[in-house]
């Protein structure tokens, strides 16, 4: 067989198959396209919400790049940035004191008779 026949035979054998590097590049391109579409949907939703909430008088077409560039941390502290919203041992103890421990004592005070094992088993197997 000469070179042309070998080349044509290899093309015929690999018809419909793609090189792994080619498939990887194609998949990455599809991922990029999906990310770009998701960014545009987010931009359109933000613009629509701003019009509905009357923050903007007209629909503004932001670019996805504008959204990425301006997605940084706010200058003012938000609710989750405040010290009272941070998960610390002190905040956890304060929450437990206000919402759990006191209410547990109230429930025990309301109960006239002590809870027995039989009561627990009956409740578990209902």
Curated annotation (Swiss-Prot):
Keyword Cytoplasm: yes
GO biological process terms on file: heat acclimation; response to heat
Gene Ontology cellular-component annotations: cytoplasm; nucleus
Keyword tags: Cytoplasm, Nucleus
Upregulation: Target of TAS1 (trans-acting siRNA precursor 1)-derived small interfering RNAs in response to temperature variations. Highly up-regulated in seedlings exposed to heat shock.
Tissue: Expressed in seedlings, leaves, stems, inflorescences and siliques.
Subcellular location(s) of the protein: Cytoplasm; Nucleus
Domain of life: Eukaryota
Keyword Flavoprotein assigned: no
Family, as annotated: Belongs to the heat induced plant HTT protein family.
Biological role stated in the UniProt entry: Mediates both basal and acquired thermotolerance.
Protein's recorded name: Protein HEAT-INDUCED TAS1 TARGET 3
